[in-house]
Amino acid sequence: MLTITAIKAFNDNYIWVLQQQPHTQVYVVDPGDASVVIDYLEANQLTLAGILLTHHHNDHTGGVAELQAYSQDRLTVYGPDNEKIEGITHPLNATAQPRLTLDYMSGELQVLDVPGHTAGHIAYVIADALFCGDTLFSGGCGRLFEGTPAQMLNSLQQLAQLPADTRVYCAHEYTFSNLKFALAVNPNNRALQDYNERAIALRRQDKATIPSTIALERAINPFLRASDTEIVDSIKQHFSDLNHANLDELGGFTLLRQWKDNF
């Protein structure tokens, strides 16, 4: 059985720990902070076997060197082959190597090319779990620091095509703020209203809203539904000074991301 555990880091990061029972060797996803990972390993008598990196931002990679030293340079470190990340031992290209196997893990690890937030961002799927870094958030998506709106839209559409029961393990607890924006854009969405109430209740108890599921995100995430009639109407109303005669899905998505950036 694969167990997935969250380690909180910084203000709102999640570092995900993957453990295939009964093994005591584990993998971590995007360890921006080594100290919290080491504390978790030692408290649970676990050994770190490897690291999965989604992109180069320091809050996702900052702990790699210290964890490698802690593990006496025995770690396998996976990450995108077209981003400058110190410490990667196994650079990945999703086109050339879309699947691989990990020691101590059952089944294959699928690698997805999801540029947008950064130019080389990748995501991982193992069993029914998606680790998508800063590409897809619950109720939102990542800012476009390096990629284009077209790249991000394509990446999100790719993720939205995963099986509905796929669990979404993003890297930040941004759900509450994302849902505020989603409700401004899509106020009559009952599924969104219900999810917002659940998210508020969870955060009041200091509990994580993650993981989400692909099914839920298809229903409530405006960035997966940029061509929905109510969302298109909201975009046109918000950007009323623009000519929307030929507004297509990419144009709507671009304006939606611009709106969120200034929300």
UniProtKB/Swiss-Prot annotation:
Catalysed conversion reaction: an S-(2-hydroxyacyl)glutathione + H2O = a 2-hydroxy carboxylate + glutathione + H(+)
Q: Which Gene3D superfamilies does the UniProt record give?
A: Ribonuclease Z/Hydroxyacylglutathione hydrolase-like
Annotated GO molecular function terms are: hydroxyacylglutathione hydrolase activity; metal ion binding
Cell membrane in keyword set: no
The prosthetic group or cofactor this protein requires is: Zn(2+)
According to its UniProt record, in which pathway does this protein act?
Secondary metabolite metabolism; methylglyoxal degradation; (R)-lactate from methylglyoxal: step 2/2
Report the InterPro entries cross-referenced here. Clx_II_MBL (IPR035680), Glyoxalase_II_hydrolase (IPR050110), HAGH_C (IPR032282), Hydroxyacylglutathione_Hdrlase (IPR017782), Metallo-B-lactamas (IPR001279), RibonucZ/Hydroxyglut_hydro (IPR036866)
EC annotation from Swiss-Prot or TrEMBL: 3.1.2.6
Report residues binding Zn(2+) 1.
Answer: H55, H57, H117, D134
Keyword Mitochondrion (UniProt): no
Q: Where does Zn(2+) 2 bind?
A: D59, H60, D134, H172
Q: Which Pfam families match?
A: HAGH_C, Lactamase_B
- Which GO biological process entries does UniProt record here? methylglyoxal catabolic process to D-lactate via S-lactoyl-glutathione
Tree of life domain: Bacteria
Give the co-factor note: Binds 2 Zn(2+) ions per subunit.
Keyword list, A-Z: Hydrolase, Metal-binding, Zinc
Q: Which family does it belong to?
A: Belongs to the metallo-beta-lactamase superfamily. Glyoxalase II family.
How would you summarize the oligomeric state and partners of this protein?
Monomer.
Q: Which PANTHER family match?
A: HYDROXYACYLGLUTATHIONE HYDROLASE, HYDROXYACYLGLUTATHIONE HYDROLASE GLOB
HAMAP family named among the record's database cross-references: Glyoxalase_2
Q: What does this protein do?
A: Thiolesterase that catalyzes the hydrolysis of S-D-lactoyl-glutathione to form glutathione and D-lactic acid.
Protein name according to UniProt: Hydroxyacylglutathione hydrolase
Native organism is: Shewanella baltica (strain OS223)
